[in-house]
Amino acid sequence: MTKVALYKQDGTQAGEVELADSIFAIEPNEAVVTDAVLMQRASLRQGTHSVKNRSTVSGGGRKPWRQKGTGNARQGSIRAPQWRGGAISMGPIPRPYAYKINRKAYRLALKSVLSDKVSAKNFVIIDELNFEKPSTKAIADSLNKLEATKKTLLVVDDANENAKLSARNLPNVQVTTASGVNVYDLVKAQKVVIVQSAVKQVEEVLG
């Protein structure tokens, strides 16, 4: 079992937490992580790009001049692709870019990134984040004491609404729940700060 330090909300160490080696101590598979990141980035694309082709561009129903006798090249419409203001041939049309990879591969990618964060000591476990009311200042103080001052992914349990509301105004902090942990967010974050109860939820899902 891999052991990681457990911290309190005030930044003091409260003990250690044992993590499952099958999730947090595997050999990272960079190829699978890359596939997972590309898949997530592709799903973020809107795919709303569109141009007008011969059937949608307006005008051009009349032949600009007769077929023969003018000395000009034959033309059938002023909206043909070679004309200025004409239609676009083989241009982009709206389409979804999203695709899926195998669930087994995605789970391996999650384990790979989590293992990399743990081995690099960029995985911080906190016993709890309790606030009587949402407070950006309070959660910023807690993260500063944990030395999570740069790009940080804060993972809380699903029921911790005050922590989610407190952290959403911090520019370098992205907050998510244990059920919403994904490869792209983990890769982007320099440090992961996770509540102990959320660790158990992650282990239940990936175990």
Curated annotation (Swiss-Prot):
Annotated Gene3D superfamilies: 3.40.1370.10
Which Pfam family name is an example for this entry? Answer: Ribosomal_L4
Q: Which organism is it from?
A: Oenococcus oeni (strain ATCC BAA-331 / PSU-1)
User: Might you name a Gene Ontology BP term for this protein?
Assistant: translation
UniProt biased composition (Polar residues): 45-57
Q: How does it assemble?
A: Part of the 50S ribosomal subunit.
| UniProt keywords, alphabetically | Ribonucleoprotein, Ribosomal protein, RNA-binding, rRNA-binding
Disordered as annotated region, ranges:
45-77
Which cellular component terms (GO) are annotated to the entry?
Answer: ribonucleoprotein complex; ribosome
Name of the featured protein:
Large ribosomal subunit protein uL4
Q: Which InterPro entries match?
A: Ribosomal_uL4 (IPR002136), Ribosomal_uL4-like (IPR013005), Ribosomal_uL4_dom_sf (IPR023574)
